[in-house]
UniProtKB/Swiss-Prot annotation:
Residues 291-355 are annotated as: Activating domain. GO terms for biological process: mRNA processing; regulation of mRNA splicing, via spliceosome; RNA splicing. It comes from Pongo abelii (Sumatran orangutan). It comes from the Eukaryota. Residues 153-230, 250-328, 439-502 form the RRM domain. Residues 400-524 are annotated as: Interaction with NCOA6. RNA-binding protein that acts as a pre-mRNA splicing factor. Acts by promoting exon inclusion via regulation of exon cassette splicing. Also acts as a transcriptional coactivator for steroid nuclear receptors ESR1/ER-alpha and ESR2/ER-beta, and JUN/AP-1, independently of the pre-mRNA splicing factor activity. Keywords: Acetylation, Activator, Isopeptide bond, mRNA processing, mRNA splicing, Nucleus, Phosphoprotein, Repeat, RNA-binding, Transcription, Transcription regulation, Ubl conjugation. It is found in: Nucleus speckle. Interacts with NCOA6 and JUN. Interacts with ESR1 and ESR2, in the presence of estradiol (E2). Interacts with RSRC1 (via Arg/Ser-rich domain). Interacts with SF3B1. Interacts with ZNF106 (via N-terminus). This is RNA-binding protein 39. InterPro entries: Nucleotide-bd_a/b_plait_sf, RBD_domain_sf, RBM39_linker, RBM39_SF, RRM_dom, RRM_dom_euk. It holds the Pfam family RBM39linker.
Length: 524
């Protein structure tokens, strides 16, 4: 059995060697495969490790960057906090809080800080910094002046253009003085200008200069300027005739009006005193022009009394306005009872010769004025007058009226212009020195240069009145020069200054039309 086994082993030995070789080869291959696998695994592990390392590095970099950013932010916050703390310290050092209560604990206060009310009080208690500019001074109200003082600084303007604005009037009157206030009178329903206004100046001296601008064109329309302060007539007789304590409407008579005055102008003048119910301006049916008188009805009698006191004698368009109470009666005027009749209240009044006489007498009462002697004789007659007497009386009254009109026209001064004439400056018969006209010319130039200058001057050596003609660069300069020279004494004579219309001056001296340069005295 053992031999059999050995023989079989011997027979199977070469096959076993081949199998061992194959197995060894297979084992070697398996080992190489394992090695290759392990190598590939190690390589993949290495790759994974490198990737993870790179990821870790990138994460670390990002963390470092974020940390650096946070550090920068924290540093900037700390810097800001330190700056704000330093500012607060400076602020607290400069401005102490008025709060004197107990201090707040940091544990209690935390991040809230002081209460809001204390912050407000601290803000309110700030004192002015020395580097801060002071506020502009508060303008004083114009009401610190009395009404009389304001009236003395105010002028009344009429005949204004429909499209005029307060700014236009302010610019126009600023040539004669500083304007404080401009008040346009407008219709309360349509809000349109009534063509009248009140202009108040800062200085009283500007009022006469502004009145001298009458006739100058503003937006193409010649303006009329009058003083606004009425000539107050507080006579005892007129005051006693008014019905004291009466309530309700009151009617006033308004006379001696210019023919160009309209109802809107009267409303603008009388309406500031109170509400007006009606205005009736009597018109001529033939010519269509105003008869120069009318009636105004106030809703309140007290307003009518104030208007009567303030506006009686008020100069309007060169005429003193007459204001009277329609229903007043006097003991000596029984003949004028028809003026107060109910028929008059309903239909108005149509004055004839007798009516005019009675009206003149009534208006003269309490004013100190005297009516013509012929009118007094007519009023003393009993009820009626013969036709011939009336005609004779009317003729004499018309003559006296014409004479008074001529006298008034002679006394009216011409409108202010750039040109004026000085009289009594020299006597040509006594002047013998060489160049005496040049000396007078230099004297006038020196004096006018104080008020705005001269652009043209002419000494009329052959004038018996000693005339010197002057043209100024502006109307305001001419007004100032005329006011300064008129009435002064020169060489033993009183100087007389009078305005000369601009076209007349240019006709006399054509070279003055192009003169624009201010003159200086020839002597040095």
């Amino acid at each position: 059995m053992a031999d059999d086994i050995d023989i079989e082993a011997m027979l199977e030995a070469p096959y076993k060697k081949d199998e061992n070789k194959l197995s060894s080869a297979n084992g070697h291959e398996e080992r190489s495969k394992k090695r290759k696998k392990s190598k590939s695994r190690s390589r993949s592990h290495e790759r994974k490790r490198s990737k993870s390392k790179e990821r870790k590095r990138s994460r670390d970099r990002e963390r470092k960057k974020s940390k650096s950013r946070e550090r920068k932010r924290s540093r900037s916050k700390e810097r800001r906090r330190s700056r704000s703390r330093s500012r607060d310290r400076r602020f607290r050092g400069r401005y102490r809080s008025p709060y004197s209560g107990p201090k707040f604990n940091s544990a209690i206060r935390g991040k809230i800080g002081l209460p809001h009310s204390i912050k407000l009080s601290r803000r309110r208690s700030r004192s002015k910094s020395p580097f801060r500019k002071d506020k502009s001074p508060v303008r004083e109200p114009i009401d610190n002046l009395t009404p009389e003082e304001r009236d003395a600084r105010t002028v009344f303007c009429m005949q204004l253009a429909a499209r005029i604005r307060p700014r236009d009037l302010e610019e126009f009157f600023s040539t004669v003085g500083k304007v404080r206030d401009v008040r346009m009178i407008s219709d309360r329903n349509s809000r349109r200008s009534k063509g009248i206004a009140y202009v108040e100046f800062v200085d009283v001296s500007s009022v006469p200069l502004a009145i001298g601008l009458t006739g100058q064109r503003v937006l193409g329309v010649p303006i009329i300027v009058q003083a606004s302060q009425a000539e107050k007539n507080r006579a005892a007789a007129m005051a006693n005739n008014l019905q004291k304590g009466s309530a309700g409407p009151m009617r006033l008579y308004v006379g001696s009006l210019h023919f160009n005055i309209t109802e809107d102008m009267l409303r603008g003048i009388f309406e500031p005193f109170g509400r007006i119910e009606s205005i009736q301006l009597m018109m001529d049916s033939e010519t269509g022009r105003s008869k120069g008188y009318g009636f105004i009805t106030f809703s309140d009698s007290e307003c009518a009394k104030k208007a009567l006191e303030q506006l009686n004698g008020f100069e309007l368009a060169g005429r003193p306005m007459k204001v009277g109470h329609v229903t007043e009666r006097t003991d000596a005027s029984s003949a004028s009872s028809f003026l107060d009749s109910d028929e008059l209240e309903r239909t108005g009044i149509d004055l004839g010769t007798t009516g005019r006489l009675q009206l003149m007498a009534r208006l003269a009462e309490g004013t100190g004025l005297q009516i013509p002697p012929a009118a007094q004789q007519a009023l003393q007659m009993s009820g009626s007058l013969a036709f011939g007497a009336v005609a004779d009386l009317q003729t004499r009254l018309s003559q006296q009226t014409e004479a008074s009109a001529l006298a008034a026209a002679a006394s009216v001064q011409p409108l202010a212009t750039q040109c004026f004439q000085l009289s009594n400056m020299f006597n040509p018969q006594t002047e013998e020195e060489v160049g005496w006209d040049t000396e007078i010319k230099d004297d006038v130039i020196e004096e006018c240069n104080k008020h705005g200058g001269v652009i043209h001057i002419y000494v009329d050596k052959n004038s018996a009145q000693g005339n010197v003609y002057v043209k100024c660069p502006s109307i305001a300069a001419a007004i100032a020069a005329v006011n300064a020279l008129h009435g002064r004494w020169f060489a033993g004579k009183m100087i007389t200054a009078a305005y000369v219309p601009l076209p007349t001056y240019h006709n006399l001296f054509p070279d003055s039309m192009t003169a624009t340069q201010l003159l200086v005295p020839s002597r040095r």
